[in-house]
């Protein structure tokens, strides 16, 4: 039976409490780490295109200020509620700690269906929401820095930064009040694909660990692995893209209208264009339509990537999931009951709280760019290329051998912004994966990777509180 009265925040608290038993921190400090520090629930009027006034419900939660600013996305959805926003803000604290990004956790949401509003109405709602955050000091480059989430994107972030700058004239670092902006407005190249690429880097690192893969009965590496992706949004699309490009076989993709299966693999860009033309992923050439979109979750595969919304795998359907590895690209796609099932089955769950940290990691890079007021690579790209050219020319003169044009182009290339962003993200995800695995392997009592990830996060936040002291 599907769990009734599901609370996402309670689910996060359960995972926290489970991990806290494996740490040395006193009870009072653990309660502070777990608590949401500030919850701003708001309602404000907006005049719609037809002249009527609609009262909009919104939230911004700051889970922790052990490091500032707070960081977390803003989602537009009719499913937005205080419980969800609190849970997501909590996960942001733990996520940032795990990947060594110096932010506290935050999250925001507006309870609307963005598809039911015109562009002008969405702009007014976004700008009014931003002004409410400014009034209560809930936004700013050193206070709380939002980002895109479900139902929002670059457009909304541009509206936010413009509103903030209008209300805070002369603030030199104002571009850092929000991330996920268009590149022309201070955004960073590589942000769009960051979460999906981070998912790939994290799972690839796990797949490269021989001892882990041996326990699962799988060969090392991602090449040839059967992958199922739930969701063809930004995260699902890019997860599928990077797995396919690195030799995996994406056999199924699901969306809200249905799911498809193709034994020899699905090209995500071709499917995206098919959906754009027809309005659906169904009837994709060469693929089989599945009866229900949830059927994709239960297909035989090596890696399952839920990249949609939370609570899609629960105590009811978890026993039928056949994947050996589940990579939580979405926030909270598994309930605690599902976790218990997978622990008993020996399925490896790579947890959301670090696996989808690519977005906040690259948001951190964007924030740093905004504070430094210079594009990554601008100062060193040409210097590096000239130096590499000189070294290569010297080697050719000394050896009497010439490299091919393709090799020369590769060797002489100086890193530009997207190269540096991708490299920084790869380093971040590899380091985080290894830290979590080291904690898990060091204590055989820790039951799963999620608990090990929470232990990692709790220890880092606890250390911060201890070193800074409790004021006053």
Which residue ranges define each predicted feature?
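Short, Gly/Pro- and small/polar-rich lid/capping loops
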Residues: 2-43
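Adenosine-phosphate binding glycine-rich loop
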Residues: 2-7, 206-207, 320, 324-472
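Conserved active-site and cofactor/substrate-binding residues in soluble primary-metabolism enzymes
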Residues: 7, 11-14, 80-83, 117-128, ...
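Glycine-rich, N-terminal phosphate-binding loop and its surrounding beta-alpha-beta segment
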Residues: 42-114
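Glycine/serine-rich phosphate-binding loop and adjoining beta1-alpha1 elements at the start
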Residues: 77, 97-223, 468
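Glycine-rich phosphate/diphosphate-binding loop of Rossmann-like nucleotide-binding domains
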Residues: 186-300
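Rossmann-like adenosine-cofactor binding region
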Residues: 258-349, 354
